Amino acid sequence: SSLEKNAYPEVNSLINSFYEAWGRKDIEQMKQLTDNLDAVDEAKVTNSTYIESYNDITVYTKPGLTDDSYVVYASYKLKFTDIKAEAPGLSQLYVMKNEDGSYIIHNDSSDEKINAYLQKVTQDEDVQKLVSQVEDDLNSAIESDEDLKAFEEQLGQDSNSSARAEEGATLTVQEDCNFRAEADTEAEILDVIPGGTEVTKVADGPEGWIEVEYNNEKGFVSQDLLR
């Protein structure tokens, strides 16, 4: 089924409230809107002091695995502190009803079934088109504003620090992540490393992967999840 735009008022309201709370760094409100907001999630929000607000939120949906559940693609304009131009962005979320019948964001990175479904839906042609459109919009915004360009470059350097780290360096896993036998998203999962865990860098893996040691075992973790 094709992407629907702002089709479900309750879902729109939930997503808007969630991103408004993120802009305010209102952890308590975010906890009420999700079924799980752990210490790593909290740190991610409170540490993102450079984010002032999420504006112009548009909610795109696809059916979830069950009735009354949805895969959500939220597009927005990100307002950074002291930067006038806004940066287009897109996030994927999973929304479902809780026991009392109200919609919440299902925020459990260890839910393999949902994770697999989210990956599958992202391959849909209309979703790929949306992702490309937002990427194009972001690139245009960056090219037309020097301040935004400089800021995004700085952010990119920060997130690539794990790739620049020396072998033997200690890195911290940013959120629960799969520890895989090979540098491939289809490879066997040896373990799930909890967010906040420190691991030792063994070597740079193929593009986008870092080989690390965890519990005396060597395996691969996505570079984006390490700092």
Where are these predicted regions, by residue range?
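A structural signal for short, hydrophobic beta-strand segments that form beta-sheets
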Residues: 56-64, 170-173, 198-204
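Short alpha-helix capping/helix-loop boundary micro-motifs
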Residues: 183-188
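SH3/SH3-like beta-barrel superfamily modules
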Residues: 191-224
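SH3-family beta-barrel domains
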Residues: 157-178, 192-195, 204-205, 227
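Short solvent-exposed beta->alpha transition segments
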Residues: 27-76, 80-88
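Hydrophobic pocket/interface hotspot
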Residues: 18, 29-31, 72, 95, ...
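Core segments of small alpha/beta cavity-forming domains
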Residues: 1-54, 116-166, 189
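Exposed beta-sheet edge and beta->alpha loop/turn motif
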Residues: 66-145, 194-198
